[in-house]
């Protein structure tokens, strides 16, 4: 009986060790795939990265960084339908995640689904106000929502967003250029020319083509 008890204890202990090892492997494998995928991204091997990230998410769907890396990889391989599917999944898992909503908004904007894009950017802005606006991409939440408003000719709505984006990123010539277009379309030609001049000073040479005819037609003094 003692020998049997010793054997049983040994068997149970060994089983626990094996199960413990299996548990560790189950935890480590998706992380290993993620790390390998990130190395692939750094080396420009985006197709391999996508496959590894999809495998990692299947094993463990609750690691946020996997979806962020997938956004980078799929954007380079143009696998947007896959990316969209997984970002929607991520949005359901990670509540009030402004960055994920922003990336989803970008997909809708590229699909010319501007109302859905505006909705996602609005969520991103709302969550960023809770999570903190020190994240480097927050200015783009406002910039991209403003761009959507501009594309659907709701120019008066775009101007406050462009203005706030400039508060967060004051040296962005593209924002000045687009706010200038919004000003022009709302009849504010002087403000438009000021923005285009500023954009030009920041390296956006195309603004000269916008600004010069307006100055000539409107008799606005050059500065």
Give the residues covered by each predicted segment.
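Terminal, low-structured helical/coil segments at or just beyond the last alpha-helical repeat
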Residues: 22-28, 190-223
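Helix-start (N-cap) detector for alpha-helical repeat units in TPR-like alpha-solenoids
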Residues: 29-30, 64-65, 98-99, 132, ...
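Canonical tetratricopeptide repeat
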Residues: 69-72, 103, 137, 144, ...
């Amino acid at each position: 009986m003692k020998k049997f008890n010793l054997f049983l204890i040994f068997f149970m202990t060994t089983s626990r060790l094996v199960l413990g090892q299996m548990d560790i492997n189950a935890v480590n494998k998706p992380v290993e795939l993620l790390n390998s995928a990130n190395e692939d991204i750094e080396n420009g091997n985006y197709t391999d990265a996508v496959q590894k990230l999809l495998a990692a998410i299947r094993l463990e769907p609750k690691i946020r960084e996997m979806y962020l890396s997938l956004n980078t990889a799929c954007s380079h391989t143009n696998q947007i339908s896959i990316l969209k599917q997984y970002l929607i999944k991520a949005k359901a898992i990670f509540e009030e995640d402004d960055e994920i909503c922003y990336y989803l908004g970008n997909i809708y904007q590229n699909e010319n689904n501007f109302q859905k894009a505006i909705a996602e950017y609005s969520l991103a802005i709302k969550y960023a106000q809770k999570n903190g606006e020190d994240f480097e991409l927050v200015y783009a939440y406002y910039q991209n929502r403003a761009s959507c408003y501009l594309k659907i000719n709701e120019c008066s709505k775009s101007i406050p967003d462009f203005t706030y984006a400039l508060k967060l990123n004051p040296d962005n010539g593209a924002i000045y250029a687009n706010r200038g277009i919004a000003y022009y379309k709302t009849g504010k030609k002087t403000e438009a020319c000021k923005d285009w001049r500023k954009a030009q000073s920041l390296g956006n040479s195309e603004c000269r083509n916008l600004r010069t005819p307006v100055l000539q037609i409107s008799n606005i003094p050059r500065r």
